[in-house]
Regions:
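Short pre-active-site segment immediately N-terminal to redox-active cysteine/selenocysteine motifs
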Residues: 37-40, 44-48, 91
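Thiol-based oxidoreductase modules, predominantly thioredoxin-like and allied folds used
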Residues: 63, 68-81
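Bacterial N-terminal signal peptides
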Residues: 12-21
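Non-catalytic, surface beta->alpha helical segment in thiol-disulfide oxidoreductase systems
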Residues: 99-127
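Bacterial N-terminal signal peptides that target proteins for export
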Residues: 2-12
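Structural micro-motif
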Residues: 88-96
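Conserved redox-active cysteine motifs that mediate thiol-disulfide chemistry
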Residues: 44-58
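A short beta-strand-turn-helix
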Residues: 26-39, 81
Length: 127
């Protein structure tokens, strides 16, 4: 197979994966955190960290549930170490919640259960 066709196939495959929902859009290209005018949850972790992997399906579900009401953002700090410094990260995963004005209002370190995340998002008015 000639190279140009191979590259076209690879690009098409990548776009199909991104468009399929396997990688939520806010994770594929993370917006500026916090997202202006929205309750924002940023989860700082790594794709290879075990508790982070346990949280991934929870965050994917909540990203769909709260779409348009809250921004759910994942940042892999092993791939982007400057982000760890920016957020004064001590452990992964860490979840940081921002109100609609962009003020950090809550920080949790370690695995966070879905019901606990929902409670914070709802308290901030994302429901």
């Amino acid at each position: 197979m000639p190279m140009p066709h191979r590259n076209t196939i690879l690009i098409g495959l990548a776009l199909a994966v991104l468009g399929s929902g396997l990688i939520p859009p806010t994770w594929a290209a993370a917006p500026q955190v916090p997202v202006k005018g929205m309750v924002t949850l940023v989860d700082l972790g790594a794709n290879s960290c075990i508790p982070c992997k346990m949280m991934a399906p929870i965050l994917e579900k909540l990203e769909k549930v709260y779409r348009g009401k809250a921004a759910i953002v994942f940042i892999d700090v092993w791939k982007t170490p400057d982000e760890a410094k920016r957020f004064n990260l001590q452990v992964i995963p860490t979840q940081i919640f921002y109100d609609k004005k962009g003020k950090e209002v809550y920080r949790h370190m370690g695995f966070m259960a879905e019901k606990d995340i929902v409670a914070v998002l709802d308290k901030l008015g994302a429901n």
